[in-house]
Amino acid sequence: MCSLRHVSIVMSQETEDGQFGEFGGRHVPEPLQEPLAQLAAAFEDVVPTDEFQEEFHYLLADFGGRPTPLYHAETLSERWGTDIYFKHEDLLHGGAHKLNNTLGQALLAKKAGKERLIAETGAGQHGTATAMVGAMLDLPVKVYMGEKDIERQEMNVFRMRLMGAEVEAVTRGNEGLAEAVDAALEDFAENMEDTHYL
């Protein structure tokens, strides 16, 4: 579980201008620099607050189902001569660890005044997790997905739509994840004032 102490340790690391240590840094296209600066400012203003931490941890537990259990794999432990445990992130709401990321990002986006969420997905797990938190936080969601991936992952497309997300088929190029990323970035570049790209 993340604590306020952990957040303060992470935030006390060198972060000015995106630098982390001697060789750290960031390189992003010019149009994305301002929204990333706004996101960094929102993160520093919102995430360390008691209000955000309490809501985030409440939602992780109540909505997400955290903490997930550990399973002691006795047979494997005996075979390998050490204790082996499996962490059951598959028991989170939605069936995957993706919720850990999307829940925090979407909550931060809402607190920062963003009005919609966009994402790209290949197999559909990230899109499904984004759709879940968008529905829970009452934020519209648009998920970009390559046409070929839509055909392969019909059940996840159904789940995203069931939760209210618009799934946009990307039909250019190889009709896969790379093209879905391009489409999502184009949407974000046009709508960055009110949109958060997960």
Q: Model segments located where?
A:
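PLP-dependent amino-acid enzyme catalytic core
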Residues: 2-198
